[in-house]
């Protein structure tokens, strides 16, 4: 998930440098959403992995 966020971030930076501002804005929004989703999923797995032993 984080690798896709990084890909879209790099894509947004390149598009912004080349002047495609609408495309850069869309790609940066996608990168931000993927980063947040990846962070939430990571936290869920971190909490779910700490089950007490019986």
Curated annotation (Swiss-Prot):
It holds the Pfam family DUF1328. It comes from the Bacteria. It is a multi-pass membrane protein. GO terms for cellular component: plasma membrane. Keywords: Cell membrane, Membrane, Transmembrane, Transmembrane helix. It is found in: Cell membrane. Its main location: membrane. InterPro entries: DUF1328. The chain crosses the membrane at residues 4-24, 29-49. Belongs to the UPF0391 family. HAMAP family: UPF0391 (MF_01361). This is UPF0391 membrane protein TERTU_3637. It comes from Teredinibacter turnerae (strain ATCC 39867 / T7901).
């Amino acid at each position: 998930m984080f690798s896709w966020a990084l890909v879209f971030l790099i894509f947004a930076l390149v598009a912004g440098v080349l002047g495609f501002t609408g495309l850069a804005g869309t790609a940066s929004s996608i990168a931000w959403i993927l980063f947040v989703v990846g962070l939430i999923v990571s936290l869920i797995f971190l909490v779910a992995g700490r089950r007490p032993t019986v």
